[in-house]
Each structure stands twice: as structure tokens, then as C-alpha cells.
Amino acid sequence: GAKKINAIVTKIKRIEDQKEQYKLDSRDLLKWIAIKTEEMGKRNFSNSLEGVQNDFKGFQVFSFSEKPPKAKEHTMLQVTFFEIEMKLKELRQPPFVPPEGQRISDIEQAWRSLEKEEHLKNTALKMEILRQQKLEQLAAQFNQKIGLRNGYLDEMILVLSDSRYGSNLSNVEASFKKHQAISADILSRENRFKDIEKKMGYFEDENYHGKGGIKKSGEGVLSKWKHLLELLSKHQQKLELDTEMLAHLRDIDTVHNSVISLQTSFDSEEFQKAANIEQSMQKLNLYESEIKAIQDSIKRLKSQGKQFSSVKGPISENIEKNVNKLEEDYKQLSSVAKTTREKFEE
């Protein structure tokens, strides 16, 4: 009898040792699961393609090296628990109740939570790798476009900065048409430069690791674009002004031709030696009304010409010179008309 009791006591002691081991092992495993579940829930990935690929390698070390031995521990805990249960049943002892939170169902639930977080992290890492790959592709395309835009801008700035550009005064109309064609070509590209601004914003929003370089090169191009538009506007204004001044010069010439034509009429033998004084007076009245109209035209031309007085250059010099000559010839014509009337009225 004593031998049998000793055997039972020994068995119970072994079971108690197993229970203690279960408590220790389950506590350690649950602690590891809690730490790893928290780690799996974090999304503090590196902000570059290479960095996030290394993050993924680190994650795979967890999945394929660190986790499998713990999965084995998890299985062994289940085996130990059922062994204890069987032995207690054999000895007709009450069932084993692990401490609160350390039951098989608790461990199972914690393990499932860990695997769920692991799956979510795996998906998130793969998505982040794809996002970083896309950003790298877009950055390469952006830099290629920056190169093209820079080439175009440098070329056009060179063209518009040339001192000979639009300076063909013998044919301002041709220069203006050429400028309009160049202007249309430049302005048709405006959306390409708006797109650069949009892309810069995109890289900023996506927190691309190279956004600083993108911003610097993008701003460089946009600054050149602004400079090109300023040059374009400056030439546009100058050519418009040249066109206006040439039209004004043509108006002066037209009035001047009228003065010369009238001068010729006064000098003509037909007028000077007219037999019929009445007929000559009629012609003189007509000429005088024309002279009055010329006087009004000169006033108008001088008033319009004031806007060009501050402009430097050969066209404005010609305007001043031609107006002076026109006034001089007009005074002479007026004097001839006055003398002629006095002669006729004697």
C-alpha cells in the first residue's frame, strides 16, 4: 500500500512540476506574442525603395526564422496541457485551471491576433514597395523632362536675348510676324510647365525622399520659364510700339505729301497765269480750305506723337525730324497762300 501511495505522490509531484513549467512557458510565449503583435502593428517604414526593401527582408527574417520555433513552442504547450489533463483524469484529480489569461484559448486568441497583424504588415510592406517603385519611376521621368525643358528654355532665352532680335527696322512687319510665330510656339507649351509645378506638389504630398532635389530642379526650370515670358512680353511691347510709330511716321508722310502737292499747285503756271481772276479765286479758296485741314492734321499728329517723345531710337528720331520738316514746309505753304491772296485782292 505504501509503495502505491508513494507512486501516486510522485506522479502528482511530476504533474505539479509540469503545471509550473506550463505557467512559465505560457507566460514567456504570451509576452513574446504581445511584443511581436505590437511590432507588426507599426508602419514606421523607411522612406526609400532600398530602405523599405530592407524592411521587408527584416520582416521575412521574423516570418521564416524567428516565428517558426515559437510556433513549435505554441504546439508543445498544447501537448503539455493535454498531457496534464489526461494524467489528472487517471488519478481522479480535479482538472488543471491555468492562471487568468494563460489558458490554451487565450494563447490561441493571442496567436491569431499576431498572425492577423503579420498578414496586414506583409500587405502594407508590399504596397509600400510598389509605391516607392512608382515614385522612383516618376522621379526618373520628371528628371528627364526637366532636362528637356531646360534645353528648350536655354535655347529660346538665347534667341530672345540676342540684340539683333526684332531689330530689323526696314521690315518691322516681318519681324512682328516672326515674333508672333515664336510667341505662339512658346505659349503652346505653358501646360508643360504647369505640369512641372503639379508634379512638384505630388512629390511633396507623397513625401518622396528626393523631394528636395525635385523642388530645386523644378524651381530652376520655372524661374527660367518666367524669365522667358518676361523677354517675350518685352519684345511684344517693343514691336507693337515700333509698329505704332511706323504707322505714325506714314501718317506724317501722307500729310507732308499733301503739303508738297499743294505747293506744286501754287507754283503751277496754270494757276499763276490764270486769265480769269474769278476762277483763280475759286481755286485759292479750295487750296486754303485744304491748308486748314492740313493744319488740323498737324495738330493731331503732334498730339499723338507726344506718347513717343520719351522713346529712344531711330524711328522716334525720324518722327521728330519729319514733323519738323512738315511744319517748316507747312509754314512756307501758308505764307505762299497768304501772299497769293494779297496779290489777287489788289
Residue ranges and their predicted role:
Residues 1-346:
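Extended alpha-helical coiled-coil rod segments
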